């Protein structure tokens, strides 16, 4: 289980899940963690509610399916403490990085959205859709995130740039899932993300915000 991998780390664990997810509730009931039930639905909603209820100075978005590797947590937090970054984005597309879960559709899609963000929003990022993120809690609060779906991936990056927060990236390897299955729908969710980014671009060009 994912929680077993981080049980010896000095961190507070907050598990966000739907109230009717009885399988996960049973799996974590004896673990050293706090359980938070979503008041809404969706991938982005779970992350937003986790951020809202976190009480530590630094936070990490860590996947319950086992695809994020805890070996990256320490170097990512060091890039905040030592290098004075406010947000560190994990990346599957840098040297010494990769993904077990990627396919040609998701790779092309990620390349497109990352390029879109870098060109039109002056981002300097290599993987805009990966939300393995370590950040200052108060910085994440200031982003005032509102996406309940996968648009949250790009919302975090775009608002980080818009608000002038200092950020960097860290190469990560997305592991094979230990549990659950891929929920993202490449075309329908991709269209939502594209629509979100176009709206943000129009707002930027017309209203400069």
How should these model regions be labeled?
Residues 1, 26, 86, 192-209:
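Terminal low-complexity segments of carbohydrate-biosynthetic enzymes
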Residues 13-15, 87-88, 167:
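Hydrophobic/aromatic residues located in beta-strands of well-ordered beta-sheets
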